[in-house]
UniProtKB/Swiss-Prot annotation:
GO MF annotation terms: small ribosomal subunit rRNA binding; structural constituent of ribosome
Family stated for the protein in its record: Belongs to the bacterial ribosomal protein bS6 family.
Gene Ontology cellular component terms for the protein in this record: cytoplasm; ribonucleoprotein complex; ribosome
Protein name as catalogued: Small ribosomal subunit protein bS6
Function comment: Binds together with bS18 to 16S ribosomal RNA.
Any GO BP: translation
Alphabetic keyword roster: Ribonucleoprotein, Ribosomal protein, RNA-binding, rRNA-binding
Record gene name: rpsF
TM annotation in the entry: none
Species the sequence originates in: Corynebacterium urealyticum (strain ATCC 43042 / DSM 7109)
CDD domains documented for this protein: bS6
Cysteine pairings via disulfide bonds: none
Ribosomal protein among keywords: yes
Domain of life of the native organism: Bacteria
Length: 95
């Protein structure tokens, strides 16, 4: 298993306190595949350098995961199907 860092930018209309609990159903994808969610860090609302989907700001969330590559690929796919998710970025951490 490898370690990944996933950054998610969510629509700013969502309340920052409800973002982490609503992510739980997506994080179950990792848990069901014998992976682990090491850290969930909600950075809060931040302004963009340029508009993304006609939005000027978004709620940033950073996840640290340990899982297989297929699992993180599926998580990214499912997150991008959600209309509240503006953008995702998956990075594999170096050893």
């Amino acid at each position: 298993m490898r370690q990944y860092e996933v950054m998610i930018i969510v629509d700013p209309s969502q309340d920052e306190r409800t973002v982490a609990p609503s992510l739980d159903k997506y994080l179950n994808i990792v848990r069901e595949e014998k992976g682990s969610v090491d850290k969930v860090d909600v950075w809060g609302k931040r302004r963009f350098e340029y508009p993304i989907q006609k939005k000027e700001e978004g709620v940033y969330i950073v996840l640290d995961l340990t899982c297989e590559s297929d699992t993180v690929r599926e998580l990214d796919r499912v997150l991008n199907l959600n209309d509240n998710v503006l953008r995702t970025k998956v990075l594999r951490k170096d050893k």
